Design a protein with these regions (language model features):
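Buried hydrophobic packing segments
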Residues: 65-73, 103-106, 144, 148, ...
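C-terminal binding/interaction regions
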Residues: 4-21, 90, 94-160, 164
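Short coil/turn connectors at secondary-structure junctions
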Residues: 13, 19-22, 50, 56-58, ...
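Glycine-rich oxoanion-binding loops at beta->alpha junctions
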Residues: 28-45, 137, 199-222
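Long amphipathic alpha-helical segments
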Residues: 14-116
Length: 222
């Protein structure tokens, strides 16, 4: 069963992280009115987090699913348990591409291994998936910053950028995808203003505005 956590929420906090034999997630269903972490201790906890959109965004869903496999194998690393965990997690969001990609990667890494080493290997592979997303976010930010610098040379006043949905750190394991260059530009001192379009079903624009507000990036929600 999911349990609340007293972990503080900071500007640089990850959306999920391992803590011992459990995983902490930022419960996005409570945002922007309440900031709280929830502890995932079982496969069922991870499945619920994905299904209920406590975690959302393709990269974050994939990483959470990977950790869900690790949570499942912590108590039973048999072939049957691995197959059950895979099926359970795939059913949470059948159309989520990163979910299936992450589970395919976990299966490929774990199925050939003896059961005695599977649990540790599952945690290692899940962490590798999280770290790969961190690196991808950083690379997107770096390359995007170069483009924004070029645009700034021919722009009078702040750069005007429009975003759709939420593609920031709430949707990933790092600084985000589409928002990563915006954060990099703001940190580099470029004048920038973001027009945040509202979307459904989870008011993702409001989540983007919440992110940008915490980072001090000028923005308008429309």
């Amino acid at each position: 069963m999911q349990t609340p956590s007293n972990a503080p929420v900071t500007d640089t906090c990850p959306t999920l992280r391992r803590e011992g034999d459990s995983v902490l997630i930022l419960d996005q269903t409570r945002l922007p009115h309440e900031e709280a972490f929830v502890r995932l201790a079982t496969l069922a906890d991870a499945a619920l987090a994905i299904r209920s959109m406590q975690v959302r965004g393709a990269p974050l869903i994939g990483a959470t699913a990977a950790y869900g496999v690790a949570l499942a194998l912590a108590s039973d690393a048999s072939d049957a348990a691995l197959a059950d965990a895979d099926a359970c997690l795939r059913a949470t969001r059948p159309t989520a591409v990163n979910l299936h990609w992450a589970l395919d990667r976990m299966l490929a890494a774990l199925a050939p291994l003896p059961t005695v080493v599977r649990s540790m290997a599952a945690w290692t592979e899940a962490e590798a998936i999280r770290c790969a997303d961190l690196a991808a976010n950083a690379a997107i930010g770096e390359h995007g910053l170069g483009l924004l610098r070029q645009l700034a040379l021919s722009t009078q006043g702040p750069l005007q950028i429009m975003t759709h949905c939420n593609a920031g750190w709430l949707a990933t394991c790092g600084h985000g995808t589409a928002l990563a260059p915006i954060y990099a530009a703001h940190a580099a001192g470029l004048a920038i203003h973001v027009w945040v379009s509202e979307t459904r079903p989870r008011n993702q624009g409001l989540l983007t505005a919440w992110e940008l507000s915490r980072a001090g990036v000028p923005h308008t929600l429309v």
